[in-house]
Regions:
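Beta1/beta-strand and adjacent pyrophosphate-binding region of the FAD-binding site
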Residues: 1-12, 170-180
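Glycine-rich flavin
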Residues: 2-4, 20-27, 32-171, 198, ...
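Flexible, glycine-rich terminal cap/loop adjacent to redox cofactors
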Residues: 7-14, 23-35, 40, 47, ...
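Short hydrophobic core segments
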Residues: 7-9, 113, 132-143, 176-177, ...
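N-terminal Rossmann-fold NAD(P) dinucleotide-binding loop
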Residues: 15, 183-184
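Gly/Ala-rich phosphate-binding loop of Rossmann-like dinucleotide-binding domains
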Residues: 19, 23, 187, 191-192
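Hydrophobic "anchor" residues
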Residues: 48, 121, 271, 298, ...
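FAD-site-proximal beta/loop scaffold in flavoenzymes
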Residues: 155-170, 257-331
Length: 459
């Protein structure tokens, strides 16, 4: 029976990075994965959706390039080729991870893991063959899966996993249940390609967990792009009606029905640890997620958990940071990654990127704050790109002048938020972040304008 110092269950961003980090520390490591290396992120999440959005962005820019002197008379979107490109990118990245495992001498065990005892894992392959392994420590990184609420008829709706399997034609229309990150990115993709899109959100605005202005601005932009948006709308049932699927919901105390060729259920994801533990083995749970302490320890010694299966924030980069931190703590090393500064991005058009506190969150916590803002009507790169309403906001402590948060809504926002995260992690003040010269012309120039507005308000 093979013995390892560490067995990692799950080869997503948290699991594979943790395994590689442990291997760099000369540990004998195995990774168990029943599907493709890279997990949801590389195969059914982050990367596939961004690849689709890249294709739809090209289509949109070509179709709407007349303002810049580009005219296209015969342009079409081939869905078979679009999804083939998506698969090609995912497969390249997944194969790359397997190559990294091989180079690092990490054993990649394909199959379903079952924790039979502390320090014991059984791996069952697709043909039903089982092998038992022992280890010093187990790291659970099994991620999450799409949620399906108990709504009558919801079996007629697809999850994001199912939608990403692909379709050989562009849907005439699609109804998206959920106005969060997943729903908005798919709404952007299909709207860009000319599909009739409807978004139904149960809260009072899109992106309800983010700054209020972001959700309100996004709704206006989507409506301008032809997307129908319903907020404060509660889905009652879903039913098949001929060739279409009808979604019945209440909105402003009125009964409404919208139909589409397809329906996507995008109301979030739940931690996945189904069937992970053998009878007689169980860890403490925090509702559906595995409960861990600040060292990622579960209630069973030598069993750890990181990423979506245990974290409150379900993001690939959070899982990666936690995986590396867990390995460092496990082997007596220091880890100084700031887990309280978590950037988050939405790849709609224009992009949205946030980090830290919003004004409302700061006030709710009793923190005195000032907010600086710049609407990017005068930003040259924004005018050239013609992406619509864009802005940047910064939140700072009213007394110490320390930066506490930022909200960006503009082209390439996802590529700029990392620098802001660095400022927050280092507790920089507005004045310190203003010291840097920013290039011209650039989208980043708007940061200086927003920060100057904030500095003026701080006095």
């Amino acid at each position: 029976m093979a013995h390892y110092e560490l067995i990692v269950i799950g080869a997503g961003p948290g699991g594979y990075e943790a395994a590689l980090h442990a291997a760099k520390l000369s540990k004998k490591v195995a990774v168990v994965e029943k599907r493709e290396a890279g997990g949801t992120c590389l195969n059914r999440g982050c990367i596939p959706t961004k690849t689709l959005l890249h294709s739809s962005q090209i289509f949109h820019d070509a179709k709407h390039g007349a303002h810049a002197g580009i005219h296209t008379d015969d342009i079409r979107a081939d869905m078979t080729e679009i999804f083939a490109y998506k698969r090609e990118i995912s497969q390249k990245l997944s194969s790359g991870i397997e190559s990294l495992f091989k180079t690092a001498k990490i054993d990649f065990l394909r199959g379903t893991a079952l924790i039979t005892a502390p320090g014991a894992v059984r791996v069952t392959d697709a043909e039903g063959g089982a092998n038992d392994y022992t280890c010093d420590d187990i790291l659970i990184a099994t991620g999450s899966v799409p949620s399906r609420p108990p709504i009558p008829g919801l079996e007629f709706a697809m999850t994001s996993d199912e939608l990403l399997e692909g379709c050989d034609h562009l849907y005439r229309s699609i109804v998206i249940i959920g106005g969060g990150v997943i729903g908005i990115e798919f709404a952007t993709f299909y709207a860009d390609l000319g599909c009739e899109v409807t978004v139904i959100e149960g809260m009072d605005r899109l992106l309800p967990n983010m700054d209020k202005e972001l959700g309100q601005s996004l709704a206006l932009i989507l409506k301008k792009q032809g997307v129908k948006v319903f907020t404060n709308a509660m889905v009652q049932s879903v039913e098949k009606t001929g060739e279409d699927i009808a979604v019945n919901f209440t909105c402003k105390e009125k009964s409404e029905t919208v139909s589409g060729e397809a329906v996507l259920c995008a109301i979030g994801r739940r931690p996945y640890c189904d069937g992970l533990f053998a009878d007689g083995i169980s860890v403490e749970m925090n509702r559906r997620s595995i409960a861990v302490n600040e060292r990622y320890e579960t209630s069973i010694p030598h069993i750890y958990a990181i990423g979506d299966v245990s974290a409150k924030i379900q993001l690939a980069h959070v899982a990666t940071a936690q995986g590396i931190a867990c390995v460092d703590l496990l082997y007596g090393r220091e880890n100084h990654t700031s887990m309280s500064v978590v950037p988050s991005c939405i790849y709609c058009r224009p992009e949205i990127a946030v980090v830290g506190l919003t004004e409302a969150e700061a006030k709710e916590a009793g923190i005195p704050v000032k907010v600086g803002k710049h609407v990017m009507f005068d930003n040259a790169k924004t005018l050239i790109a013609d992406p619509g309403r864009c802005f940047m906001k910064f939140v700072a402590h009213a007394e110490t002048r320390e930066l506490l948060g930022a909200q960006l809504m503009c082209k390439h926002a996802s590529d700029m938020i990392g620098g802001v995260s660095q400022a927050l992690a280092n507790h920089m003040t507005v004045d310190q972040f203003l010291l840097a010269m920013r290039p011209h012309p650039s989208f980043e120039e708007a940061m200086t304008a927003a920060l100057e507005d904030l500095a003026q308000k701080l006095g």
